[in-house]
Amino acid sequence: MGKKYSLSIGLNLVDPKAYDGEWDGALACCEKDAEDINKVAVSLSYDKNDLLLTKSATRNNVLKKLAEYAKALSADDYLLLYYSGHGGQVTDTNKDEDDNSDETWCLYDGELIDDELYACLSEFQPGVRIYVLS
């Protein structure tokens, strides 16, 4: 068995400035959910376990971690990617969605669009097993 990495993301709030100045996305237990998944990965002896909670769960930090993992992992390695927080929809600009909407993760400082996540995950080498729980 290869290397096993995990990235657990949990947001109890978002920065209202990134969401039209009013909405803070308050949720009660998303940080706890991410902490619990991280504990599971630790208990299963994952080689690397990263946890991004609320203010550290920024677009840059998530994209940077995924890029780091894409360079480090190879065939027969595993990535567990967990997200607990709000999701959203925005207008599809590249016309690849039948419903004309892209789905998003609402990160602390802005939304991460499904196309961006797909592009990041496409950087992993063939044979890396990626499990996304969202």
Language model region names:
Residues 1-99, 127:
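Boundary/activation segment at the start of structured domains
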Residues 6, 97, 103-134:
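Catalytic cores of nucleophile-dependent amide-cleaving enzymes
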